[in-house]
């Protein structure tokens, strides 16, 4: 956004939280989902979306420590199965390529309970960690902006794990599926633990809307007859929405494969101007009229 976020914001502001889809990668500010929805409904939408490998752990931290302090009475939470189950699971990021990926990850400490940790938390030279993380992050962002390698980083990590046979690394993404058809239970449990934590922290709001966002690959799989609604992640997120009194809104129920192809950039799958606009219009029609 290009406006200050402070205590003078309207009390009926809406928090938007998520990754690069929420931030609006690929379009100008005025064409992002948040800006379009704001103009459509006449209410301030505070955009707390963030690109660069941002998952449920960071989103929970961001809301708890910053966004929750601002005036608002509703939340829109973007959830992307294609990314959100692996962003904060260290097993997916342990190759040498990701040695200095300084991000918060989850780890299980007891049944149904997780904590946040940083991979370099025992190293005393925090400046060196930050410097290496910054350099690595810049390389990643250049790869994402100017090549088709956003997901290639994960692919390299999986291949590294496969050939080195590291036991604490996910050996292949194929057996775990992808996106709407992802079925790594450990990754699902850890990720959704923090999604639920985020929603519970927003329990005082008038409404919490969870928007599940598919990818083109998900539509291809659905077109070929695959069904995801009996998989663990979907059943779990349905249960969480009920437990937190949130509304679950699955975009895959409202678009066809051919529709989606017109809504995204061919280079990376983020919404184009039309995609941001049509999704904002759909959200308005269903929840703000």
Q: Where do the language-model regions lie?
A:
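Conserved SGNH/GDSL esterase-like catalytic core that processes O-acyl groups on lipids
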Residues: 23-108
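Loop/turn elements at helix/coil->beta-strand transitions in domains of secreted/extracellular proteins
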Residues: 42-44, 71-75, 203-209, 244-246
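Membrane/wall-proximal cationic-aromatic binding patches
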Residues: 1-40, 44, 57, 168-181, ...
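Serine-dependent acyl-ester chemistry module
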Residues: 82-238, 254-260
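Catalytic His-Asp segment of secreted/periplasmic serine-dependent ester chemistry enzymes
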Residues: 217-222, 227-289
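Active-site-proximal beta-strand/loop segments in catalytic clefts of secreted hydrolases
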Residues: 17-18, 48-50, 78-80, 213-215, ...
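Short, amphipathic alpha-helical "lid/cap" segments that border enzyme active or binding sites
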Residues: 56, 60, 188, 192, ...
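Generic structural signal for small/hydrophobic residues in well-ordered secondary structure
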Residues: 19, 59, 75, 202, ...
């Amino acid at each position: 956004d290009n406006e200050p976020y402070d205590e003078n914001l309207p009390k009926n502001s809406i928090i938007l939280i998520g990754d690069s889809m929420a931030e609006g990668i690929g379009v100008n500010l005025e064409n992002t989902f948040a800006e379009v929805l704001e103009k459509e409904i006449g209410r301030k939408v505070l955009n707390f979306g963030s690109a660069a490998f941002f998952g449920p752990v960071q989103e929970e931290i961001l809301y708890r420590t910053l966004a929750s302090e601002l005036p608002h009475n509703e939340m829109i939470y973007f959830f992307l199965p294609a990314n959100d189950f692996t962003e904060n699971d260290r097993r997916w990021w342990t190759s040498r390529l990701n040695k200095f990926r300084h991000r918060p990850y989850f780890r299980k400490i007891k049944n149904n309970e997780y904590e946040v940790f940083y991979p370099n938390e025992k190293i005393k030279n925090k400046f060196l960690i930050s410097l290496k993380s910054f350099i690595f992050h810049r390389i990643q962002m250049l790869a994402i902006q100017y090549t088709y390698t956003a997901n290639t980083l994960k692919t390299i990590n999986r291949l590294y794990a496969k050939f080195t046979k590291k036991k604490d690394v996910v050996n292949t993404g194929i057996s775990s599926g992808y996106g709407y058809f992802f079925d790594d239970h450990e990754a699902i449990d850890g990720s959704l633990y923090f999604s639920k934590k985020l929603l519970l922290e927003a329990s005082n709001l008038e409404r919490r809307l969870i928007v599940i966002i598919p990818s083109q690959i998900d539509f291809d799989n659905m077109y070929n007859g695959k069904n995801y609604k009996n998989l663990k992640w979907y059943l779990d997120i349905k249960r969480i929405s009920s437990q937190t009194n949130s509304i679950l809104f699955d975009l895959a129920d409202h678009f066809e494969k051919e529709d989606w192809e017109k809504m995204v950039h061919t280079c990376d799958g983020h919404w184009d101007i039309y995609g941001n606009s049509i999704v904002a219009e759909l959200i308005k029609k269903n929840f703000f009229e």
